[in-house]
Design a protein with these regions (language model features):
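Surface-exposed charge patches
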Residues: 61, 101, 131
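Flanking helices and flexible, charged tails adjoining ferredoxin-like Fe-S electron-transfer domains
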Residues: 5-7, 77-81, 120-201
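Short, electropositive, low-hydrophobicity segments enriched in small/polar residues
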Residues: 34, 110, 129
């Protein structure tokens, strides 16, 4: 059980809880990711039984750390299922890229207006791409794999790397937009000054 009297308890508890979560980043718990859910538990804003991918064993680990009773998975947030990976039907894929954008760990590869595919070894089975696909080209396929702590660690690293890349890309687009806006403003100002000078002459 976590020592609640230690300094920076909430932060340290949230980190410890996060390490016990499967890192699928599925959002079934109602939060944006595993870290956010872990923090909510640490701050007593959420119960420990919202993580369906973690299953009964996951709840037991969270219970042991927090001292809370090991409740059954709350069915409102899903149910424990065998691990499954996403697979895209190439005959249905329209290349819209929505699955790529939805994947929290960068496991979907392809080019806009071309076919996309799932890198199954990187897939966490979150199912977010299934929800994002407008033509039902994505399905979840059970493959007999049992999710491990090593898988969780790899998924967490993939998630953080994907997040960093997307933030950098968004920042670059913002900078480009600002530059384009500044250039347009400069051109407009030059045109106005030229118009004024022509009127004076």
């Amino acid at each position: 059980m976590f020592a609640m009297s230690e300094p920076n308890t909430t932060e340290r508890l949230a980190e410890a809880l996060c390490r016990l979560l499967p890192q699928t980043q599925c959002r079934q718990c109602g939060f944006d990711g595993c870290a956010q859910y872990a923090r909510a538990i640490a701050e007593d804003r959420a119960k420990i039984n919202r993580c369906a991918p973690g299953g009964k064993k996951g709840v037991e680990k969270l219970a042991a750390l927090t001292g809370h009773p090991a409740l059954e998975i709350d069915s409102e947030y899903g149910r424990e299922l065998p691990f499954a990976v996403a697979r895209i039907d190439p005959k249905r894929c329209i290349g819209c890229r929505l699955c790529h954008s939805a994947c929290p760990v960068g496991a979907v590869s392809g080019l806009p207006k071309h076919l996309f595919a799932v890198i199954e070894s990187s897939c966490t089975g979150c199912g977010l791409c299934v929800c994002a696909c407008p033509v039902n080209a994505v399905e979840m396929i059970e493959n007999g794999h049992v999710w491990t702590t090593e898988d969780a660690a790899r998924a967490k690293a993939d998630y953080e790397r994907t997040n960093a890349r997307r933030k950098a890309s968004a920042e670059q687009r913002r900078a480009q937009l600002e530059k384009a806006t500044d250039n347009k403003s400069a051109v407009l100002m030059q045109a106005l000054l030229k118009a004024k000078s022509l009127k004076k002459s």
